[in-house]
Structures are given as structure tokens and as C-alpha cells.
Amino acid sequence: MNPNQKIITIGSICMVVGIISLILQIGNIISIWVSHSIQTGNQNQPETCNQSIITYENNTWVNQTYVNISNTNFVAEQAVAPVALAGNSSLCPISGWAIYSKDNGIRIGSRGDVFVIREPFISCSHLECRTLFLTQGALLNDKHSNGTVKDRSPYRTLMSCPVGEAPSPYNSRFESVAWSASACHDGISWLTVGISGPDNGAVAVLKYNGIITDTIKSWRNNILRTQESECACVNGSCFTVMTDGPSNGQASYKIFKIEKGKVVKSVELNAPNYHYEECSCYPDAGEITCVCRDNWHGSNRPWVSFNQNLEYQIGYICSGVFGDNPRPNDGTGSCGPVSSNGAYGVKGFSFKYGNGVWIGRTKSTSSRSGFEMVWDPNGWTETDSSFSVKQDIVAITDWSGYSGSFVQHPELTGLDCMRPCFWVELIRGRPKENTIWTSGSSISFCGVNSDTVGWSWPDGAELPFTIDK
């Protein structure tokens, strides 16, 4: 091959290589453009993934779904119109109680940042259930937990966290400054009632969607106090019961009707010889039933039921299966206060089913220990002590405490009835144990018409803690 042919051959090869390289570069550019177009086109397409977050903006619940596309997060939003909880359904028929939650707050608090609390309770919206609780402005196993046996102080606040979680600074939200409280959701927003201030002039601050909407001043100047459990909502109105006056004698009791955080009506009960404290209230077929604590002279529980116009009836649970603590052994009941061991008491609850009643109570007749549910098929109206079902919740050898009712509306469960539920406070520390603090964890159960089991679900923390030694 002569020199000219070599030059032509080499030039041809270089040209072919150059053309191939150019084609590859053009293909690469086209590929990048197509990929970018696909990503851009998908930005406004909601897709399914595993993480959803609920936020609240301008009285509209917003479902935010995070969509992962090529390591980039986009947010697809779909508004859910708020609807007031009807509250018109009857209680669901049940045969027993299934465990719903247990927070193990004291066990976790031995090494973790967990609030010192008391008076926990549960309330549900149409989207979620939350545990509400009164903190002492302190953490377990810390010096500020000293002396937290005290009920009323300026450091106490109402806070909330997702049900079943130990209450900590990392999962809890502030609700109100309070040493006595109630809260509930009307289907549109949360209503909180927080009482704070001096014993002779406390004020209840009402908040709706976190904003102060009204206040209620102590009218007897003697420790204004409320339920320590959820209020009850029907057709956009929420109802709560408050007490003002002696804890060991005749006091004053009022029912309040609240709409969007504003008191629209109230009535004082005409209830001589009755004593109502720390009522546990629930809606049933459009009306409200509250079962309360008689701290004056009754070892059975007083009740008040009322309609949305606050027309009310009052009475005591007649059953000889007594529900308060302290109390006598079961025997002959009364539709008025049973005076034997009637002084003092503990917050509790019952659910009325016609003439029958589910009674929640401590197992011990003299101390806040153990817990059980008892079904008395005639107990709302009859005075005998016969019952047909008893389900163990906490063994008598383990501490219990306050207990109260809450419900899950059909808008949450999808059922055609109101599901009855209850929680039990498991108090630990002072005055019964050798610690510098008083706090508690909680368990909860919901009524079902299927298989259940009796057992013991105690607090389970090993005391004392490091701070106590």
C-alpha cells in the first residue's frame, strides 16, 4: 500500500469513529431529556406509598402523602371536609373487653425522658385516638420529680400524645395549663378545658383548635374541678360537667353545653344529698350519660343523664355490686347513696345497657389496687348483687388508680354503633411506695362482641429509681 492509500485509509477510519461518537452523544442527550420529561410529568400525579401525615389547616383536615420519586419527595394533598360527629348511635352490643393500649411509661421512664404525670385519659376524633394527661412539669428520675404527689400546682399542664406511647417531650404536644382538665373532638377540632389558679378562685380556660375561646370562673370559690376524662360531643355540641364546693359535703354541680369552644348554655343540678366529682361521660343515642364519684357519702356511683337541651335526670347505680373505693363487700345496693364506707372515693365509670350495667372497679375494697369489669344484667335498676360476667384486668397485688370511659364514634370505626372503651391509670410512687415522686402509666380496653380474655396487665416498673436512693 503506497503512502497515499495509507493516508486515505487512516482518514476514513477516523471519520467513522468520529461519526459513531457523535451518534452516541446525541443518544445520551435524548435519553437524559426523556428521563427528565418523565420525572416532571409525574410530579403532579399522586401515588401510593407508606407514609401519611395528618395536618390541620383552617378547619380542614389535610391528608398529606409523601411520594418518593428518584430520591426526591413531593407532597400530594387531598382535603377532607370536616363533619361534626353525630353522636346519635347507640352503644355497640358487647360480650367482653379487648386490650387496646398500654404505654409502659414508668418502665421506659427509668432510662428515658418520660413525663411525671397523673390523671391520664383517652379521647378520639374521627381520625385518631390520643392520650391526654396532666404533667407535673418534670421528668421521671429527675430532681424536679420530688414532691409531685401534690395535685394542684402552677407547673401542671394538659398535654397529649398518640395513644399507647409513653408521654415524653418528643412525642407530646401542649394543650393547656391545668391541674384539672377535660378534652374532646367534635369532628372539626379539639376542645380542651383546662382549670388552673388558686383554690379560692380558679378559672377554666376553653380552647378550640388551640385558641382561647371562652373562660369559666369558679362560682363557689372552692376548687373548681372537672372530669379528668373526655367530654362528650353530639351534633357539633360538646358537654362537660364541673363541680365547685366541698369534697366531703354538699357541693354545686353544673353541666355546660359548648359549641366551637364557646359556652352556649349551662344548668346547675338540683341535687340535694348528691355528690358529683370527676364524671365519666359518653354519648348514647343522642343523649349523654355521666357516671361519677361520690366523695362525700356513697360507695356506689351517682349518675346524671341529659339531652342536648340539658334536661336531666339523676340517680345512683342501684346494684349491690358496688363500684367505688373504698366500699363494703358486695351486698344489697340502693338507688340512693350507700353510706357504708362511703366517704372518700376514686374516679371511675360504668356503661348502661337498658337495665343492665358494666361496672369497672378496683379489685380491692380498701386500696387502689387491682381492676375488674363486672356485668350486672339488672344492676342499673335492681339492688341485688348477682352478676353474670367478671373479667380480670389487673391483679389485686398490683396498683391501679383512676379509671374512666371513652368512646369511638362510627366515623372512626366504620361500625354502625358507638364502641364503648375505658382506660385505667396505674399509679406508682408516693404515697404507697418509697420514692420521691408520684406518676403513672395507663392501659385501655374496648368493648367487643367476640372472644376476650381476663389476665393482669400491671404497670410492671421495678422501684425505686436511681433518684430515690
UniProtKB/Swiss-Prot annotation:
UniProt region (Hypervariable stalk region), positions on chain: 36-90
One GO term (biological process): viral budding from plasma membrane
Carbohydrate attachment residues: 50, 58, 63, 68, 88, 146, 235
Residue numbers binding Ca(2+): 294, 298, 324
Positions of disulphide bridges: 92-417, 124-129, 184-231, 233-238, 279-292, 281-290, 318-335, 421-446
UniProt topological domain (Virion surface) ranges: 28-469
Cofactor requirement: Ca(2+)
TM helices/strands, residue ranges: 7-27
Entry EC no(s): 3.2.1.18
Protein modification: N-glycosylated.
Highest taxon of the lineage: Viruses
Membrane topology, Intravirion segments: 1-6
SUPFAM superfamilies xref list: Sialidases
Record membrane topology: Single-pass type II membrane protein
Residues bound to substrate: 118, 152, 277-278, 293, 368
InterPro entries the record matches: Glyco_hydro_34 (IPR001860), Sialidase_Influenza_A/B (IPR033654), Sialidase_sf (IPR036278)
Major site of localization recorded for this protein: virion
Compartments where located: Virion membrane; Host apical cell membrane
Sequence segments annotated as region (Head of neuraminidase): 91-469
Regulation: Inhibited by the neuraminidase inhibitors zanamivir (Relenza) and oseltamivir (Tamiflu). These drugs interfere with the release of progeny virus from infected cells and are effective against all influenza strains. Resistance to neuraminidase inhibitors is quite rare.
Further comment: The influenza A genome consist of 8 RNA segments. Genetic variation of hemagglutinin and/or neuraminidase genes results in the emergence of new influenza strains. The mechanism of variation can be the result of point mutations or the result of genetic reassortment between segments of two different strains.
Cited HAMAP family: INFV_NRAM (MF_04071)
Function: Catalyzes the removal of terminal sialic acid residues from viral and cellular glycoconjugates. Cleaves off the terminal sialic acids on the glycosylated HA during virus budding to facilitate virus release. Additionally helps virus spread through the circulation by further removing sialic acids from the cell surface. These cleavages prevent self-aggregation and ensure the efficient spread of the progeny virus from cell to cell. Otherwise, infection would be limited to one round of replication.
Protein name from the UniProt record: Neuraminidase
Record organism: Influenza A virus (strain A/Parrot/Ulster/1973 H7N1)
Gene: NA
